Amino acid sequence: MTPTIFISAGEASGELYGALLASSLRQHFAPKGQRAELIGMGGPRMAAAGVECVVRSEDMAVMGFTEIVLHLPRIYREFRKLKRAIRARRPTVAVLIDFPEIHFRLAREFHRLGIPVIYFVSPQLWAWKQHRIRLVRRFVQRMLVIFPFEEKFYRERGIEAEFVGHPLADLPPPSVTHEEFARGAAQINQDQWNYGPYSTTGLPAGTRPINGEIHDELDPHKQWIALLPGSRMPEILSNLKGMIDAAALLGNEYEYIIPLAPTLTEKQIAAIQYDLGDRILAGIEHPPRITFVRDARAALFHARASVVASGTATVEAALIGNPFVVVYRVSRLTYAIARRLVKVSYVAMANLIAGKCVVPELIQNDFTATNIVQHLRQLLPEGPARESMKMELGAIRKALHVHPAAGRGNHLGAIETVAAIIIREIEAAYPAAQEAAQP
């Protein structure tokens, strides 16, 4: 028999990890001509890696308390589709990647069916909703965490947890040169889902240029500033205006690059461009020069500095090591509720890992163009502020690796470590797969 592995991710970062994990699992089975069936929820990268995506992650990805309520009918419809697939296919093991709003409910379903659950990338229970610990204790067999302090948090609460390192910390720096990225002539790391500058000519029919200020190519002789508004439509539309206002205030001495999450559809990209033109750039006398790109890592690597919406992208920015400013804005109701529930001093993971304010955080009312520009003007030129942040970010990168010399882990990267743990779970649950599943 062929083992069936359920892999589920709901956001752009988790979807990347799901795709890398799917590829690693296939490599485990391939040498002896065996295979595993991979099903779950994901996006284009997971599908390209061989996962049969029963539900598309973009159909479930919403944010905030009020936003979730607005999309409940669609969420319930897609959730029922997932449950039907789980009952019909009866996976050997389930791997749930972050996205707790959906995955805790799925974990309950797997528990009912006697299917072991491995949770990869912990929900931020140490920050809020600690009552969900009981759900982890009841429905999750193994918690695999990507931040070092999370292992202690779970073990102190009687939950088996292991720090496997951060997947992004294992990636080499982007190999594309500044000039190549400017031309959009190279695909980063040979990944079929990463691209250079995103051409507006690839948008659906009827999409128009925006004020003449969206370009398909960057000027390699100017310094670039990356603007990362998020990976989901509501947060992108919420964060983009403040970022563009800051770019206009800073001026055309710089060019501005906006990486678009690979989980976004062409229709969503077109909607973002319309919003940019009709709502944002239309009111700016001297609009900044903007280029959309597909590869966030290369954008962060080649940008002189970045403005990054709070989320996984802040980890990516910290690992790249160039200075950045963290921003975020949600609805007033969402923010009011979050202030009562969140129990940490910082929102940026770089600051949480460091235990101090390494990167500036501009949240809600502090998220203004003036404040962004004030911080960027300190970080863009060579000087103490820039060098101090780069040094602190280097220390954070080291903290996100598992070091064999310290008696922890091995020489595998985070994804390979997770794959090996999944294989062992399959061997325990499905002895007939042991020979086929040997690494």
PLM region spans:
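Nucleotide-activated sugar donor-binding and catalytic core shared by glycosyltransferases
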Residues: 1-439
